[in-house]
Amino acid sequence: MSVWTNWDPLEEVIVGDCYAPGDLDWCISLELRPVFNNMLLETKQDLDNLAALLKDLGAIVHRPRLYHYQQPINLSSFSVDIPMAPIVPRDQYLVYGNTIYQTFTSMIDRFFDGRSYYDIFKTLFENGSNWISQPMPNLWPMTDSKKWMDNYSNLGRMVYHRLYAKHLLWHTATMFKCGEHLITNTQGPGSQSGLAWMQRNLPANTIVSADSDALQNWGHIDHGFFMTDDDTVFCVDRSFVPEVLQNKTIHEIKSYFPPEKKQRIVQNFEHLLDESKGYEQVVSFNTNVLVVDPHNVIFSDHHAVLFDHLMSLGVRCHVAPLRHRAFWAAGIHCVTLDIKRRGNKRKIVNEV
């Protein structure tokens, strides 16, 4: 059971899951319930559809367990007001080599997220995988964030480099699996202490800095570019490609995409969006894809001209819509976690 890249043939994968309509009625006003419950219904349908597609493509699919809460959970120093469903496994979990890395972030609504994945990871552990976790942090509410963020141009860096600088917190979605190396946005989101924890639990020199012009070592790295084999990169434009991959064969595909439309978030749902997430970034959902193998890639939208172009290069494109991806801040790659791929550890990045 191992994973060394983002593109070796996928054998086992986790697909996130969502609450059903009515599960969160206890914290949603009567006025907003019809709209929000429809959003839950469609999100669950989309995730189930993605899981079915992956099964059709030959992967074994695992789903997290849903735990239902009926009230906020008070933990003395902070309260988990709305424990969200395990929709996005990519942010706090990484399977690299034969080890499961479990982290914590400033996202209070995902504080108990690990419970949902416990059975899956325990089975991997029983079958020989290693499983390690960051210590549980002591967080605090930031509902009055405007009082302390007014003087900072970047809330995310403020959260992790100042407010939580001494906490072990890390977003695993900052890391791109590339054989012997994890190409990483080393500034976060996540604290430098959290990065140090990752470094100490990995072989020496595994982590290499992304240094891409577009991301400047900040943000989730699983968009803007993807690879289909050891030597081929597809990207919005070269500015998203990490410096250590600039010598690969690079295909810029921005011209094939229509402008991304901002999805309108239902008014008065702001209380469901945690200001303390510490993750500010413009995300290219068009390239937040799951590479099933070097010849099959899953997108969340259909792009006929792009798909024809990729087919001419030997890559078949599949579509699994995510109708509310903007609300959940999650594309296809975000809502999945590859836990087994057929391939060996190898040197892919030549200049480190």
Across the structure, where does each feature detected by a protein language model lie?
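The feature marks the mature, well-folded catalytic cores of soluble enzymes
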Residues: 1-352
